[in-house]
From Swiss-Prot:
InterPro entries: Cellulose_deg_GH3 (IPR050288), Fn3-like (IPR026891), Glyco_hydro_3_AS (IPR019800), Glyco_hydro_3_C (IPR002772), Glyco_hydro_3_C_sf (IPR036881), Glyco_hydro_3_N (IPR001764), Glyco_hydro_3_N_sf (IPR036962), Glycoside_hydrolase_SF (IPR017853). It comes from the Eukaryota. Residues 395-555 form the PA14 domain. This is Probable beta-glucosidase I. Beta-glucosidases are one of a number of cellulolytic enzymes involved in the degradation of cellulosic biomass. Catalyzes the last step releasing glucose from the inhibitory cellobiose. Glycans are attached at residue 197. One of its GO terms (cellular component) is extracellular region. It comes from Aspergillus terreus (strain NIH 2624 / FGSC A1156). The active site is at 225.
C-alpha cells in the first residue's frame, strides 16, 4: 500500500471511480482503483473476536467473552489489552477494519443482541468501548463503533421507527458513543438499521452530520450496516460515506445520475470519497496486501489473556455460608445442560469458529483432584443438537461429506462441482463461492454415517434457508421442502426446525443424507428480512428421553453428594441476532431441575450462563449463585478458576437483573407495533428506573460479591475554580478514597462514583454513575484510589428547549460505593448555570 495524497487523488478520479469507492464490492471488501494506487480494504466482524471473511468453513479465531461479560469486569486496562489482541487477530486475518465494538443500550432483557453491548449505562459502556477501541487502533487497525443509534431490538429492525425524546437520545443512547469518542476517536462508525423519529439513521443528517461530525468534531468514515442503506441521494447527502456490502444496490448508476443532475452536489460527493481515502491512509502503515490469506494465531499468551478475561467477568451474586470456593480435594457432582457444552458466544454476526473451547465440565475436571461425576438433569437445546460431530464420513473421519451440484437430485445426470469435508452440521452459506457456481441456485448432498450408542427413538430436525430433506438409509425422515414455516435462525431468514423420528439400534451404522437446495428453491415468505446469499442449513438429532427421569436422577445424585454445582442458562440458540427473546425464562425444565436439586442438596452452587438477565424463581432458595455469561474460548477454565478460588471473583453487574420481565421499564413498549416502538421510559433505563420508583430488582446494577472484604474510607473531593467565561470548560473533580482489603485473600475492588443532583428544572434520576476505578489489593493492603470526572459531564442534562446541555447551579452529592452496602458521601457545587455543546 502507498500513502495517498488525498486531495490530488480526488482531482484525478473520474466520477465513475468516485461512485465505485462509496460502496463495497462484496461482503467484506471496499473497491479499489489500481491506476491511482487505491487498494481494496478488508473488514471483519466483530464485537467479540475477528472472524475473518467467511461465515462458512472459515479460519478459526480467538473468541473473547461477550460484551456484557467484559462489561462486568469494569476494567478499562483489561479492555485495552483485549483491544490490542483483537488488532493482532485482525492483522492475522488480513483485515484492516474491525466491525466493533458494539455500544447500544439494553432497554430490555429481551434484546436478541443485548449480549453484544457492554452495559445499560453510558458511562460504563462508553469508557470500556473507548479503551477497547484504543487498543485496536494502537495496532493500526480501524475500529468501528456501532450501531449508531437506537438499534436496541431485533424485531423489524430494518423498518422499525424508534420514537425517542431528544433528551433520552442524548443522555442514554448517544452517551456511550460520545464518551468512547473522547477516549479514542474511532476510524469508523456504523449506522443502525432502524429509523429514529421518522428517518432511517443511514439517511439522517441530524445524527450523522450535525451531531457526529459538526458537534463532536469527528472526521472518520461512516458506513452502513449490512443492507442498511435505503436511498441514494438522501444517504449521500446525510453523510453516509460507504454502502455495505457489495454489490451495491444504491450507488453505481443511480448515484452517478444523482451527481450529474445536482441531486448530490459534487463537493458532497468529494467529501464522501475523501473519508474513504482518509481511511485508506489510516490503515496504510499495516502493510496488509490485498486479498491477504487468513491465518490463525492462538498463542499461549493470547490463551492466558482470554482465560483472565473469562474469570474477571464472572459475578458472584450470592455466597451464603461461604459455599464457595469449592474444595479441590473433595469429590464433586456436576449437573446441568450447560456443563458439557461450551456456551462461548451469542448468535449472529458476533459468532465465530473458535480455535478451541473449554466446557465447564472440562474446566472443573482439570481443577479437581477428587472424583468428578456428571448428571444431565435436563436438556436445554432450542433446536436438536448438531448431528455432524457424531457422524463419520465414508473414509472414517469425524463429520460428513458436502457435495455441491448445479442440478437437483432429481436430474437424470449431474456433475459434481465441489466437495468439502465438514464437521459442523450448521452452515451459513452467505460467503460460499466457487468459480463454477454462477447462480444463487445450486444443490448440496451432505452424506455421512451415524452409529448410535443407545437403543431408542431418535428425533431428527432440519432447519433451512432453502429446502432440505433428511434421509436415513434411504427413508425420508424429515421433509422441509414444502409448506415451510418461518423461524428465527440465520438472522430470522430460516424455517422453523421441522422434525421427524426413527427408532435406532445401538451399534448399528446408519447412512444419513441431507438433500439441500439453496434459498431460491424455497417458497418461504421472507418479506421484512434480508436473505444473505445462497442460504443456510442445520440438521440435528437427539435420543428421546424422559425429562422427569433426568431430573429425578440428578436430584437423587445431589442428595448423596458432598459438593454439587449446576450449570444452566442460555446458548447462542436462545440469544441471537435477528430475533428477540419472547421471555426472560430459562429453557423449559431448567427451573424445575434447579429447584429439585436445591431441595435435595441446599448447598448446591448454581452457575448461570447467559448474555442478559434471566428469571430466577429459585434465587432465594440457593446459597451460592454465579453469573458466568458467554465466556469465550476459555469459558470453562475461567469458571473453574473462580469456583475453586484460584481467582477471586471481582465482576460487577453491568445490567440490572429484574425479578420478572414486567418490572422492566420497557415492558409495555419493547416490540415494534405498526412499524414503530415508543421509548416510553425516556431517560429511566435500567437502574435509573428502579431507583426512581423504589422498586428493588433481583440483583442491582453494580452488584457483585467477593471471597474477601473491603473497606472504603477517607473520601475527599478536589475541585478547581469554574471558568464561567468558557461555556464548555471541563473543570476536573478528583474524588480520592482509601480502599483496604480487610479479608483473608487477595482481590480486586471496583470503586463506583455516583452523582446525585439537587432539585433542577426537570425530573432527573435519583443518581447516575459518573466514574469508576478498579484496584487490586493483597490481604491487609490499602491504596488511595483517584477517580477524575469533568464537572460539566457529571452534572448536565439535555435541555430540549435550548437544544443544549444544561449544568445547573446547585449542590451535588457524590456517593462512592463498591462491594457491600456502605456508601461514602461528599458534595461539590456548581456555582453558575451553564449551557454547552460539544464532545
Amino acid at each position: 500500500m502507498t500513502r495517498l495524497d488525498v486531495e490530488k487523488t480526488i482531482e484525478e478520479l473520474t466520477l465513475g471511480e468516485k461512485v465505485a469507492l462509496t460502496a463495497g464490492i462484496d461482503f467484506w471488501h471496499t473497491a479499489s482503483v489500481p491506476r491511482l494506487n487505491i487498494p481494496t480494504l478488508r473488514m471483519s466482524d466483530g464485537p467479540n473476536g475477528v472472524r475473518g471473511t467467511r461465515f462458512f468453513n472459515g479460519v478459526p479465531a480467538a473468541c473473547f467473552p461477550c460484551a456484557t461479560a467484559l462489561g462486568a469486569t469494569w476494567d478499562t486496562e483489561l479492555l485495552h489489552e483485549c483491544g490490542r489482541l483483537m488488532g493482532e487477530e485482525s492483522i492475522a486475518k488480513g483485515s484492516h477494519i474491525i466491525l466493533g465494538p458494539t455500544i447500544n443500550t439494553q432497554r430490555s432483557p429481551l434484546g436478541g443482541r443485548g449480549f453484544e453491548s457492554f452495559a445499560e449505562d453510558g458511562v460504563l459502556s462508553g469508557n470500556l468501548a473507548g479503551y477497547m477501541s484504543k487498543g485496536i487502533q494502537e495496532k493500526g487497525v480501524a475500529a468501528t463503533l456501532k450501531h449508531f443509534v437506537c438499534n436496541d431490538q431485533e424485531h423489524e429492525r430494518l423498518a422499525v421507527d424508534s420514537i425517542v425524546t431528544m433528551r433520552a437520545m442524548r443522555e442514554i443512547y448517544l452517551m456511550p458513543f460520545q464518551l468512547a469518542m473522547r477516549i479514542c476517536p474511532t476510524a469508523c462508525v456504523m449506522t443502525a438499521y432502524n429509523k429514529v423519529n421518522g428517518t432511517h439513521v443511514s439517511e439522517n443528517k441530524q445524527i450523522i452530520t450535525d451531531i457526529l461530525r459538526k458537534e463532536w468534531g469527528w472526521d472518520g468514515l461512516v458506513m452502513s450496516d449490512w443492507f442498511g442503506t435505503y436511498s441514494t441521494s438522501e444517504a449521500i447527502n446525510a453523510g453516509l460515506d460507504l454502502e455495505m456490502p457489495g454489490k451495491t444496490r444504491w450507488r453505481s448508476t443511480p448515484l452517478a445520475h444523482a451527481v450529474s443532475s445536482n441531486k448530490v452536489a459534487e463537493f458532497v460527493m468529494d467529501e464522501r470519497v475523501r473519508n474513504v481515502l482518509n481511511l485508506v491512509n489510516f490503515v496504510e502503515p499495516l502493510g496488509i496486501p490485498e486479498n491477504c490469506p487468513e491465518k490463525a494465531l492462538n498463542r499461549p499468551q493470547d490463551q492466558a489473556l482470554l482465560r483472565r478475561a473469562a474469570a474477571e467477568s464472572i459475578v458472584l451474586m450470592k455466597n451464603d455460608d461461604n459455599i464457595l470456593p469449592l474444595k479441590k480435594d473433595k469429590p464433586i457432582l456436576v449437573i446441568g445442560p450447560n456443563a458439557k457444552i461450551a456456551a462461548y458466544c451469542g448468535g449472529g454476526s458476533a459468532s465465530l469458529d473458535p480455535y478451541y473451547t473449554v466446557t465447564p465440565f472440562e474446566g472443573v475436571s482439570a481443577k479437581s483432584t477428587g472424583a468428578v461425576t456428571f448428571s444431565q438433569g435436563v436438556y436445554s437445546h432450542k433446536q436438536l443438537p448438531e448431528l455432524g460431530p457424531l457422524m463419520k464420513s465414508a473414509d472414517g473421519k469425524k463429520g460428513f461429506s458436502f457435495r455441491v451440484y448445479k442440478e437437483p437430485v432429481s436430474a437424470p445426470s449431474r456433475e459434481l462441482v465441489d466437495e468439502l469435508h465438514l464437521v459442523s452440521s450448521s452452515g451459513f452459506l452467505m460467503d460460499y463461492v466457487h468459480p463454477k457456481i454462477d447462480s444463487l441456485t445450486f444443490y448440496v448432498d451432505m452424506e455421512g454415517y451415524f452409529t448410535p450408542e443407545e437403543d431408542g427413538v431418535y428425533d431428527f430436525g432440519v432447519t433451512v434457508v432453502g429446502t432440505g430433506k433428511l434421509l436415513i438409509d434411504g427413508e425420508t425422515v424429515v421433509d422441509n421442502t414444502k409448506n415451510q414455516r418461518p423461524g428465527s435462525a440465520f438472522f430470522g431468514t430460516a424455517t422453523v426446525e421441522e422434525q421427524g423420528s426413527k427408532e435406532l439400534k445401538a451399534g448399528q451404522t446408519y447412512k444419513v443424507v441431507l438433500e439441500f437446495g439453496t434459498a431460491p428453491t424455497s417458497d418461504l415468505d421472507t418479506r421484512g428480512v434480508v436473505v444473505f446469499g445462497p442460504g443456510g442449513f442445520r440438521f440435528g438429532a437427539s435420543r428421546r428421553v424422559s425429562q422427569e427421569e433426568l431430573i429425578a436422577k440428578a436430584a437423587d445424585a445431589a442428595a448423596q453428594a458432598e459438593q454439587v454445582v449446576i450449570f444452566a442458562g442460555l446458548t447462542s440458540e436462545w440469544e441471537t441476532e435477528g430475533h428477540d427473546r419472547d421471555h426472560m425464562d430459562l429453557p423449559p425444565g431448567s427451573d424445575e431441575m434447579i429447584q429439585r436439586v436445591l431441595a435435595a442438596n441446599p448447598n448446591t452452587a448454581v452457575v448461570i450462563q447467559s448474555g442478559t438477565p434471566v428469571t430466577m424463581p429459585w434465587a432465594a432458595q440457593t446459597k451460592a449463585l454465579v453469573q458466568a455469561w458467554f465466556g469465550g474460548n476459555e469459558c470453562g477454565n475461567g469458571i473453574a478458576d473462580v469456583l475453586y478460588g484460584d481467582v477471586n471473583p471481582a465482576g460487577k453487574l453491568p445490567l440490572s437483573f429484574p425479578v420478572r420481565l414486567q418490572d422492566n421499564p420497557s415492558y409495555l413498549n419493547f416490540r415494534s407495533e405498526r412499524g414503530r416502538v415508543l421509548y416510553g421510559e425516556d431517560v429511566y433505563v435500567g437502574y435509573r428506573y428502579y431507583e426512581k420508583v423504589n422498586l428493588a430488582p433481583l440483583f442491582p446494577f453494580g452488584h457483585g460479591l467477593s471471597y474477601t472484604t473491603f473497606e472504603r474510607s477517607d473520601l475527599t473531593l478536589a475541585t478547581v475554580p469554574e471558568k464561567p467565561q468558557y461555556e464548555t470548560a471541563g473543570e476536573p473533580i478528583t474524588a480520592s478514597v482509601t480502599v483496604t482489603n480487610t479479608g483473608p485473600v487477595a482481590g480486586a475492588e471496583v470503586v463506583q462514583l455516583w452523582v446525585r443532583p439537587p432539585p433542577t428544572g426537570v425530573n432527573r434520576p435519583v443518581r447516575e454513575l459518573k466514574g469508576f476505578a478498579k484496584v487490586m489489593l493483597n490481604p491487609g493492603e490499602q491504596k488511595r484510589v483517584d477517580i477524575v470526572v469533568e464537572k460539566k459531564l457529571a452534572t448536565s442534562w439535555w435541555d430540549e428547549q435550548r437544544e443544549m446541555w444544561a449544568s445547573e447551579k446547585g449542590q451535588y452529592e457524590v456517593q462512592v460505593t463498591g462491594t457491600g452496602a456502605d456508601v461514602l458521601t461528599s458534595s461539590f457545587a456548581v456555582e453558575k448555570t451553564r449551557f454547552w455543546l460539544g464532545l
